[in-house]
Amino acid sequence: MSQAKGLKEVSYVDIIGGGQVTIQGNYCYIAHMDAPAGTSILDISDPKHPKQVAHIPIPAGVHTHKVRVENDLMVVNWECPPPYIHDDSFQGGMLVYDVSNPAKPKELCFWKSAGAGVHRFDFDGRYAYITPTVEGYHLNIAMILDLKDPTKPEEVGRWWMPGQHVAGGETPDEGYRLTWCHHILRRGNRLYVAYWHAGMVILDIEDMSKPKLVSRLQYSPAFAHPTHTVLPMPFEVAGRKIAIVADEDVRKLRPSPPAFMWLVDITDEKQPVPISTYQIEGLENRNMPEFSGCHEPAEQVYSTEIPVAWFEFGLRLVDVKNPHAPKEVGYFVPDTPSGFDRPQTNDVFLTKEGLMYVIDRNRGLHILERA
C-alpha cells in the first residue's frame, strides 16, 4: 500500500516504466526505460483522467529514456542500453520530432554520434545541450547543438574534462573515478554540469563555440556516489545563490549508505561551497543495495519546496528555505509494481500549478499535489 505525508494522489496511469517525464501544454511525454517501449504521449488536459494519444516503439538493443519538448519539437536520446557495451554496428545519437500535433509525432531527423550515443540533455527550443560519446574522446563529453534547422542539427561547441581527449594525446584519469559528462542544465549563459565521479562543473557559454570553465567541485572519492544533477535555484535563498546537487545511488565506489542530496552555495560561482546535505532520516548509517537512495530533483522549481525522486523511497519533498538545514515536508512512496521487489521512483516534473508527475522506472505514472 502506498504511503504519503503532505502529498495526495490526483490520478494514476498504469503504464510501462520510464526514465523521464516532461510536460508541455496539455501533454505529458514519457521516455521509457526498455525496448520495445520508446516514447509515450498522454493528453493531460484533465489530470484526473490522462489519456494516451501516441506511442513510438523502438527496436531491441536501444535505450531512449530521456525526452524534452519545446517549440513543438521533441528531442529523444538514442543510446546503447546499460552497461553501454556495443559493437561497431551500433549507431547512437539523438532523434528530433515535430510534435505540433502531439497525437501524430513526425520524425524530422536522426543526429548521429559515435560510440554508445547520447545519454542526457537539456533543450531550450533552439539549442540542445547534450552528453554524447564522440570519436577520439574517452566516454561522454559536453556538446552544444543548434537546432535552428531541426532537420539538420549542427554542433556549435564542446567541452571536456582534461584527460578525455585521447586522440589529442590526453590520458584519462580512470581509476575508480569514472570521468564522463552525465547531465547538463542551462540557465542563462551558464551550463551546470554533472560530471559523474568528477563532480559538478559550471561552464560559461557567453561564446557558445568556446565553453569556458568557471569552477569545479569534486567530493569523490571521499564520498562514494557520482554526481547526477546540478540544479541552480531560480532565485536567491536566504540571500544566497544555491544549487541543489543530487548524487545518484548507483556506481558507488564502495559499500555505503544510500546517495543523498547536497546544497552548494554558488554565490561566488568561482568557489562553490557545500553548506549542507539532506538524507532520509534513518538511512545515514545503513549500507543498502544500489537504487535505494537519491536520484534527481525536479528540474523546474518555483518555491523552496523541492520534489526529489528517491528510487526505493519514492518522492521526497524537501524544503530548502533554510539552506543550512533542509527539511523534509512531505513524501509519497508508491506501491511496489507487480512483478518487482520495490518501488523505483525515477523522475518528477513539477508544473507551475503545483502538480507533480512522478514516473517509476519499472511501471506507473503518479500525478500528485500538495495535501
Q: What positions do the PLM features span?
A:
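Feature marking well-ordered beta-strand scaffolds used for ligand recognition
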Residues: 1-371
